[in-house]
Swiss-Prot record:
Induction and repression of expression: By nickel ions.
Consequences of knocking out this gene: Cells do not express urease.
Function, as annotated: Ammonia produced by ureolysis increases the gastric pH thereby providing an environment permissive for colonization of the stomach.
Protein name per the record: Urease subunit beta
Protein residues bound to substrate: H221
PANTHER family per record: UREASE
Taxonomic source organism: Helicobacter pylori (strain ATCC 700392 / 26695) (Campylobacter pylori)
NCBIfam families reported for this sequence: PRK13207.1, PRK13985.1, urease_alph
Domain Urease, residue spans: 131-569
Pfam families xref list: Amidohydro_1, Urease_alpha
Length: 569
């Protein structure tokens, strides 16, 4: 067999085992752990290449042959960082490994058979990740959805009804009628969607009715009154219907302090939003719940990474989002109590320790919907620059840290909200919601987004040009966005109760409708690469944060990666 240099090999087939790839302009280095494509048997599409009839493409149609194969992709996932062909069939990932013609090539799996019905997408030199999942969405404007999608987010969970004051402040779609409208509106979009109902009620019947109307869980928010009674009732109903409860706790400590909230939760699983507290929650010590075994703690992206500008920008955001008035002294004091540089500084470190498990946006309500992925990687890079390599790393790479941070916006929010059977990772059997990145633009600008196995968004040149690449090149909607294809390519998530009662038929929905599962039988230990529990305390006078007796903090960055270099205009 003829041998070629590693440099030639990488230029032709992409990086292989032992090769290293820098993510964007960060200091994060991914090393290829394994290559499943088999040297000498690689797939390559194009003139004079191997992916042709009678060679890597079988002549014989079969029930196994793929709809699409992504060749020689570098997969970055919580399951590993490795190179493989990815086979897609019927909108799902059918196989990962060595694809091709099993009659002519060694090592080809039955579920990776290339035939006359197979389309090819060249993954050489590209990184493939699962689509991101943002679990903290205020559905204030529908324009958020394409903005998030272009960033690599393919699933949005939250609540709202548009720019009503309740939605500006809280991620809640309250009541059967509002849920009906939002479930119907979801039909329009290239995005998996799920809606949270109002959990602020000490009445089980009103709570249950919303779940049966299609909500996938509850949001309890202080602006509607996060009382111990509301917490208890929402969790009781959630346990009955197997749905998640998300909470924004009581900043003013009117109905109780953090200890009272934890007593009301009583060891049951709960997803805590913006657990640091600048986005809301018991002042000054809501952050201490992040160390508990039954809490799935999340950040929203305004506070990560911690920079020299973080504190200053929060006051105006808070005033607008929570309908406050700068001329009212008490409103200003309320805002001041939430913006604490000390706890914000600790948040970055808690992410690096795997104590915080999830990142999200808080879209248009103290959060930027298109920056979940970017800010997650900025935080990872900031922490590496400040604290060095993690002790868990093996070899001269950052693979463990990469898996830790990737999990925060992919598999962990999927597990938290009962959708990990469908999305959240690059695994066989899951929906083919995949994001393709050039390594140089990783975390900032995807090359292409595949939705339900079909190309939905891509960087594309002038439509009147003779080839696809001439300027201006920018994101353009592809065919999965249009006609009835969008119904097959996207999912509306509902509760099992609503699914069993035929919510799809009742509301005349054409999209895929799937039920959430296993929301209650999970704990912090189910959070991949982010399952650390600890005893956290906050000094009530200085706001300094201590983990197992040791102070944790970080410095505000005056420069971050993945920033203006990638956004000239």
């Amino acid at each position: 067999m003829k041998k070629i240099s590693r440099k030639e090999y990488v230029s032709m087939y992409g990086p292989t085992t032992g090769d290293k790839v820098r993510l964007g302009d960060t200091d994060l280095i991914a090393e290829v752990e394994h290559d499943y494509t088999i040297y000498g048997e690689e797939l390559k599409f194009g003139g004079g290449k191997t992916l042709r009839e009678g060679m890597s493409q079988s002549n014989n149609p079969s029930k196994e042959e793929l709809d699409l194969i992504i060749t020689n992709a570098l997969i970055v996932d919580y399951t590993g960082i490795y190179k493989a062909d990815i086979g897609i069939k019927d909108g799902k990932i059918a196989g990962i490994g060595k694809g091709g013609n099993k009659d002519m090539q060694d090592g080809v799996k039955n579920n990776l058979s290339v035939g006359p019905a197979t389309e090819a997408l060249a993954g050489e030199g590209l990184i493939v990740t699962a689509g991101g999942i943002d679990t903290h969405i205020h559905f204030i404007s529908p324009q958020q959805i394409p903005t998030a999608f272009a960033s690599g987010v393919t699933t949005m969970i939250g609540g709202g009804t548009g720019p009503a004051d309740g939605t500006n402040a809280t991620t809640i779609t309250p009541g059967r009628r509002n849920l009906k409208w939002m479930l119907r509106a979801a039909e329009e979009y290239s995005m998996n969607l799920g809606f949270l109902a109002k959990g602020n009620a000490s009445n089980d019947a009103s709570l249950a009715d919303q779940i049966e109307a299609g909500a996938i869980g509850f949001k309890i928010h202080e602006d509607w009154g996060t009382t111990p009674s509301a917490i208890n009732h929402a969790l009781d109903v959630a346990d009955k219907y197997d749905v998640q409860v998300a909470i924004h706790t009581d900043t003013l400590n009117e109905a109780g302090c953090v200890e009272d909230t934890m007593a009301a939760i009583a060891g049951r699983t709960m997803h805590t939003f913006h657990t640091e507290g600048a986005g809301g929650g018991h002042a000054p010590d809501i952050i201490k719940v992040a160390g508990e075994h039954n809490i799935l703690p999340a950040s929203t992206n305004p506070t990560i990474p911690f920079t020299v500008n973080t504190e200053a920008e929060h006051m105006d955001m808070l005033m607008v989002c929570h309908h406050l008035d700068k001329s009212i002294k008490e409103d200003v004091q309320f805002a001041d109590s939430r913006i604490r540089p000390q706890t914000i500084a600790a948040e970055d470190t808690l992410h690096d320790m795997g104590i915080f498990s999830i990142t999200s946006s808080d879209s248009q309500a103290m959060g930027r919907v298109g920056e979940v992925i970017t800010r997650t990687w900025q935080t990872a890079d900031k922490n590496k620059k400040e604290f060095g390599r993690l002790k868990e790393e093996k070899g001269d790479n950052d693979n463990f840290r990469i898996k830790r941070y990737l999990s925060k916006y992919t598999i962990n929010p999927a597990i938290a909200h009962g959708i990990s059977e469908y999305v959240g990772s690059v695994e066989v059997g899951k929906v083919a919601d995949l994001v393709l990145w050039s390594p140089a633009f990783f975390g900032v600008k995807p090359n292409m987004i595949i939705k339900g196995g079909f190309i939905a968004l891509s960087q594309m040149g002038d439509a009147n040009a003779s080839i696809p690449t001439p300027q201006p090149v920018y994101y353009r909607e592809m065919f999965a966005h249009h006609g009835k294809a969008k119904y097959d390519a996207n999912i509306t998530f509902v509760s099992q109760a609503a699914y069993d009662k035929g919510i799809k038929e009742e509301l005349g929905l054409e999209r895929q409708v799937l039920p959430v599962k296993n929301c209650r039988n999970i704990t912090k230990k189910d959070m991949q690469f982010n399952d650390t529990t600890a005893h956290i305390e906050v000094n009530p006078e200085t706001y300094h944060v201590f983990v197992d007796g040791k102070e944790v903090t970080s410095k505000p960055a005056n420069k971050v990666s993945l920033a203006q270099l990638f956004s000239i205009f």
